[in-house]
From Swiss-Prot:
Coiled coil: 703-732
Gene3D superfamilies: YhbY-like
Residue spans of biased composition, Basic and acidic residues class: 831-842
Descriptive protein name: CRM-domain containing factor CFM3, chloroplastic/mitochondrial
Pfam families, per database record: CRS1_YhbY
Encoding gene, per UniProt annotation: CFM3
InterPro entries membership: CRS1/CFM2/CFM3, RNA-binding_CRM, YhbY-like_sf
Role summary: Binds specific group II introns in chloroplasts and facilitates their splicing. Acts on subgroup IIB introns. The substrates of the subgroup IIB also require the CRM domain proteins CAF1 or CAF2, with a simultaneous binding of CFM3 and CAF1 or CAF2. May influence the biogenesis of the mitochondrial small ribosomal subunit.
A cellular-component GO term for this protein: chloroplast stroma
Length: 842
C-alpha cells in the first residue's frame, strides 16, 4: 500500500512544498545547526505551515508511513514530534540526542585544542578558538532570511531618489501625490543660476493653490541632480516625491499652512532643573522623600544628558555660524540667490567698484620666516578651505577694489578667503579675476577652478592696527632722515672753501704727456706694423687651433658613425651563389628591354636601397609577368650599376638593361626561363625595412662627415702653410698676404661656418627621428608608398656640392648609349666571373 500510494503522493504534492516539510525529528548536524542559528541570535519566526495536498490515508495503511513521510496538516509538524512533545510535557523525558553524545572537554584544557566541530576549520596554529565558528560562518543565513535594512542605512548609490518621501509619507498618499504631479502640465524652469530667490517665491506662490509643483532643471545644476535635490528641499522646505532625469516633483508638506516654528535656543541646564519639579508638583517639599529623590535624580540625569549633547555636538556649530554671520554682515550685503547652504556669502558685485585712495595692504615678513608656503602647508590649507562655506560670491571680472578691501578685513580674523563664482554670468574669466585680486591684496592663491577661488593672506600679512603703527614709525624715520639731510646741506653751503694761489696740474693731459716723455717707452715708426703682424699671427694660430679641434671632433663623430653603421650592417649578408647564371641572347635582351621600358607597372626604389621588401615585390610582380621594371633615383651611374647587380644577385633573375629615363634610371630584370617561386619571398640575408632606413641614414651621415672631415683637413693644411709663409715674411712684411688672409678668414665667417656645421649635423638627427616614425607604416613597396623616400632636390644640392664635377661626368657617361654596359653584362654572362664581380661591387 505504501508503494502504491507513493506515486499519487508524488504526483499531487508540489516539489516546493515537499521541500518545506520537515521529514525527520532527529537533531541536525552541528554545522547545519550553526548555519541556521548562528550564535542563537537574529532567529527568525518559523515559516507558516505548508498546505498539505496529499489524500487522506486509508485505515488499512501503516501509521509508520505517515510518521516517516508526512506531517500533520494542522501544525505542519511530524506526528512523531507531536507525540514526543506531549510525552515531555507529561514528564516522560527521554534521552536527548545531544546529551547522549560524549561530553566535550572543558574550554581551555589541553584536550580542547584537538576538538573539531563540523563546519569549523582549524586556525593557523592548528587549533580551534571559541570564536572560530562565528568568524568562519558569520551571518550564515540566506539573503532572503536576513532582515531588510532601513532605506536610510542603505548605500547612497542603492537608495531610491525619493527615499525620504517614502519614509515620511504613506504609500497610498505618495501614490496619490505622484498621480497628481503627472497631471500637472505647467512646470517651473530652473536655469543655470540654480534655486534663486525668485524661483523659491514662484514655487511658494504655486503652493497656495496646488499641493505639488513640477520643476524642470537645465544648465549647470542639471549636471548634479542629487545636489540640486538637497538644495531645493533646503531652500523651499518641501519634499521631493518624484525625480527622473532633470524633472522633479516637489510636495509642499503636510503642515504647510501652519506657521513655521521659530528657532529657539535650548534651555540651560539650570532652567531645566528648576522647571521640571514645578510641573510635577506645586510644592516639592510635600512629596515623600524617596519620590523627591527619584525625581531629583531623574532631573539631574536629564539635565546632564541634555547639557552634554548641547555642549559636545551643537555648541561649536552654533558658535561658528553666529560668528561667521556677524563677520559677513560687517563686510557687505548678502547674496540671497546662493544655492548652497548657510551662511549666505557676501555679494561682491554690490561692493564698490573703485575706492578712492585704496592701496594694497602694508606687508612685512618677519625675520627668519620663509616667504613661500611649503607643500605640506599648502595641502593642509587647501583641505581646510575645501570644507568651508564661501565668503564672497563674485560675478564680474574687473573693478574689484571693494572686494579686495573686504578680503583684507576678513583676513584679520580668518587666514583664508574663499570666493564662489556665480553661475550663468557671461563674459567672466576666473583667471583674470584671480590676477586682479592678487595684485590688489597681495595674497597667495591656493586653488582656482570653475566654481571657487581660494586665497591665503600670506605670512607677511599684518593687521590694520599693527600696519598703522609700523607705517607711523616708518614715516617718523623718514622725516628724521630728511631733517638731517637738510641740515647737512645748510652746513655745506655756509662752509668757507680755501682758495689756492696756483692751480694744480694733477690728472690733466699735460701731466700725462710729460710723464710719458720722461719715463715712457719710445717706439719706432714700424712699431704699429709689427704689432699688427703679431696680432695677425696670433689670430692665425688661434684659427688653426680651432680648426684642429673641429677636426678632432669630426673624426670622433666619423668613428662613431662607422661603429653605428657596422652595427646596423651586422644582419646584412649578401648572396654568394656559385650557380652558373642563365643566359639570354642579344635578340631576347633587345625584346625584353623594349617590353620592360613600355611597362606601366613599376617599382620605386627609394633611399632604403635593396632590402627584403624589394625582393618580395619583385617576386610578386613575377607571379603575373616575366619582367619587372624598377625606377631608381641615384646620384651617379655607378650607384645605379651597383644596385642593378645587387638586385640580380639577390632575386635570382637576369639583368636585362639599365636605361636613363625622365624619372631617373630604369632597371629591367627578367625572372628567367626556369623560374620557380621561392618558399619565402623575403630573403633572410637582407635587412628589414626599418634597418634599411637606419642604414641609409647612417651612410648619409658617414658621407657627410667624411666630406666635412676632408674639407677641414684641407683647410688646416692650407693654414699651416700660410703660417710658415708668414714666418718667412715676418721681417719685411707682405701687405698682399695680410690682405688676403683678412679677406679669407674673418671672425664673422668662422661664426657662420660653425652655425652651418651645427645645423648640418642637427638636420641628420631630425631625419633619424622622422625615419623612425616613418617605419611604423605599411611595408607595401608601391609607387605611392616610396615617393617620400627620395631625398629632396634641395637636400641633394646641399649635400653634394663637392661632387658636382663627378656627377657631371656620370651624367655624361650615362648620356652615351648603354651599349657598353650591355656589352659588359653580356660578357659577364659568358663565364663565372660575373658573380664574383657582383659580390665585389656590392
Amino acid at each position: 500500500m505504501a508503494m502504491a500510494s507513493s506515486p499519487a503522493c508524488h504526483f499531487r504534492h508540489p516539489p516546493r512544498l515537499r521541500l518545506l516539510l520537515p521529514l525527520s525529528t532527529s537533531a541536525p548536524h552541528p554545522w547545519l545547526y550553526s548555519w541556521s542559528h548562528p550564535r542563537q541570535r537574529g532567529r527568525l519566526r518559523a515559516p507558516p505551515a505548508a498546505l498539505d495536498l496529499r489524500p487522506e490515508p486509508s485505515p488499512s495503511s501503516d501509521s509508520d508511513d505517515e510518521d516517516a513521510v508526512g506531517a500533520s496538516r494542522s501544525s505542519g509538524r511530524s506526528t512523531m514530534s507531536l507525540i514526543l512533545s506531549r510525552l515531555r510535557r507529561a514528564g516522560y523525558s527521554g534521552e536527548d540526542p545531544r546529551a547522549a553524545a560524549p561530553p566535550h572537554p572543558p574550554r581551555g584544557s589541553v584536550e580542547d585544542v584537538f576538538r573539531a566541530d563540523d563546519g569549523v576549520l582549524p586556525n593557523a596554529r592548528g587549533g580551534f578558538d571559541a570564536d572560530d565558528e562565528e568568524r568562519a560562518l558569520g551571518d550564515a543565513r540566506f539573503p532572503w532570511e536576513r532582515p531588510m535594512p532601513p532605506p536610510e542605512a542603505a548605500p547612497r548609490s542603492a537608495r531610491s531618489p525619493t527615499w525620504m518621501a517614502e519614509l515620511t509619507l504613506p504609500a497610498a498618499e505618495l501614490r496619490r501625490l505622484r498621480h497628481a504631479a503627472i497631471r500637472i502640465k505647467s512646470r517651473t524652469k530652473v536655469g543655470g543660476a540654480g534655486v534663486t530667490r525668485e524661483i523659491v517665491e514662484k514655487i511658494k506662490e504655486k503652493w497656495k493653490t496646488e499641493e505639488v509643483v513640477r520643476v524642470k532643471v537645465s544648465g549647470t545644476p542639471a549636471l548634479n541632480m542629487r545636489l540640486f535635490h538637497e538644495i531645493l528641499e533646503r531652500k523651499t522646505g518641501g519634499l521631493v516625491i518624484w525625480r527622473s532625469g532633470t524633472s522633479v516633483s516637489l510636495y509642499r508638506g503636510v503642515d504647510y499652512d501652519e506657521p513655521e516654528p521659530t528657532k529657539k535656543s535650548k534651555k540651560n541646564s539650570q532652567s531645566l532643573a528648576m522647571d521640571f519639579p514645578i510641573k510635577g508638583s506645586s510644592n516639592p517639599s510635600l512629596l515623600p522623600t524617596e519620590t523627591a529623590n527619584s525625581v531629583r535624580d531623574s532631573n539631574v540625569a536629564l539635565v546632564s544628558n541634555a547639557a552634554k549633547e548641547e555642549l559636545v555636538v551643537q555648541a561649536p556649530e552654533i558658535k561658528y555660524e553666529d560668528e561667521i554671520d556677524k563677520l559677513l554682515d560687517e563686510l557687505g550685503p548678502r547674496y540671497t540667490d546662493w544655492p548652497g547652504s548657510d551662511p549666505l556669502p557676501v555679494d561682491a558685485d554690490l561692493l564698490p567698484a573703485n575706492m578712492p585712495g585704496y592701496k594694497p595692504p602694508f606687508r612685512v615678513l618677519p625675520y627668519g620666516v620663509r616667504p613661500s608656503l611649503s607643500r605640506r602647508d599648502t595641502t593642509n590649507l587647501r583641505r581646510l578651505a575645501r570644507g568651508l562655506p564661501p565668503h564672497f560670491a563674485l560675478g564680474r571680472s574687473r573693478q574689484l577694489q571693494g572686494l579686495a578691501n573686504a578680503m583684507v578685513k576678513l583676513w584679520e580674523k580668518s587666514s583664508i578667503a574663499k570666493i564662489a563664482l556665480k553661475r550663468g554670468v557671461q563674459l567672466t574669466t576666473s583667471e583674470r579675476m584671480a590676477e586682479d585680486i592678487k595684485k590688489l591684496t597681495g595674497g597667495v592663491m591656493l586653488s582656482r577652478n570653475n566654481e571657487f577661488i581660494v586665497f591665503y593672506r600670506g605670512k607677511d600679512f599684518l593687521s590694520s592696527e599693527l600696519a598703522e603703527v609700523l607705517l607711523e614709525r616708518e614715516r617718523l624715520a623718514k622725516s628724521l632722515q630728511d631733517e638731517e639731510e637738510a641740515r647737512r646741506k645748510a652746513a655745506s653751503y655756509f662752509s668757507s672753501a680755501e682758495t689756492y694761489a696756483q692751480p694744480t696740474v694733477a690728472g690733466t693731459l699735460g701731466e700725462t704727456l710729460e710723464a710719458n716723455s720722461k719715463y715712457g717707452t719710445k717706439h719706432d715708426e714700424n712699431h704699429a706694423d709689427k704689432m699688427a703682424r703679431t696680432i695677425e699671427a696670433a689670430r692665425h694660430a688661434d684659427l688653426v687651433r680651432k680648426l684642429e679641434w673641429k677636426l678632432s671632433l669630426a673624426q670622433k663623430k666619423m668613428e662613431k658613425a662607422e661603429r653605428v653603421l657596422g652595427k646596423v650592417e651586422t644582419a646584412l649578408r649578401p648572396t654568394e651563389d656559385s650557380r652558373p647564371p642563365e643566359t639570354i641572347t642579344d635578340e631576347e635582351r633587345f625584346m625584353f628591354r623594349k617590353l620592360g621600358l613600355r611597362m606601366k607597372a613599376f617599382l620605386l626604389l627609394g633611399r632604403r636601397g635593396v632590402f627584403d621588401g624589394t625582393i618580395e615585390n619583385m617576386h610578386l610582380h613575377w607571379k603575373y609577368r616575366e619582367l619587372v621594371k624598377i625606377l631608381v633615383k641615384a646620384k651617379s651611374f655607378a650607384d645605379v650599376k651597383r644596385i642593378a647587380l645587387s638586385l640580380e644577385a639577390e632575386s635570382g633573375g637576369i639583368l636585362v638593361s639599365v636605361d636613363k629615363v625622365s624619372k631617373g634610371y630604369a632597371i629591367v630584370v627578367f625572372r628567367g626561363k626556369n623560374y620557380r617561386r621561392p618558399s619565402s619571398l623575403r630573403p633572410r640575408n637582407l635587412l628589414s625595412k626599418r634597418k634599411a632606413l637606419a642604414r641609409s641614414i647612417e651612410l648619409q651621415r658617414h658621407q657627410a662627415l667624411s666630406r666635412h672631415f676632408a674639407k677641414l683637413n684641407r683647410k688646416v693644411e692650407r693654414l699651416k702653410a700660410e703660417l710658415v709663409q708668414m714666418e718667412d715674411v715676418k721681417e719685411q712684411g707682405d701687405e698682399e698676404l695680410y690682405a688676403k688672409l683678412d679677406a679669407a678668414y674673418s671672425s664673422d665667417d668662422e661664426d657662420m661656418e660653425d652655425e652651418d656645421d651645427e645645423a648640418y649635423l642637427k638636420r641628420f638627427d631630425n631625419e633619424v627621428a622622422g625615419a623612425t616614425a616613418d617605419d611604423d607604416g605599411s611595408d607595401d613597396y608601391t609607387s605611392a608608398a616610396d615617393e617620400a623616400d627620395y631625398p629632396d632636390s634641395d637636400d641633394e644640392a646641399g649635400d653634394c656640392s663637392e661632387d658636382e664635377g663627378e656627377d657631371d661626368e656620370d651624367e655624361a657617361a650615362a648620356g652615351v648609349s648603354d651599349a657598353g654596359f650591355h656589352g659588359e653584362v653580356v660578357g659577364f654572362s659568358s663565364d663565372t666571373d660575373r658573380r664574383n664581380h657582383d659580390v665585389n661591387e656590392y
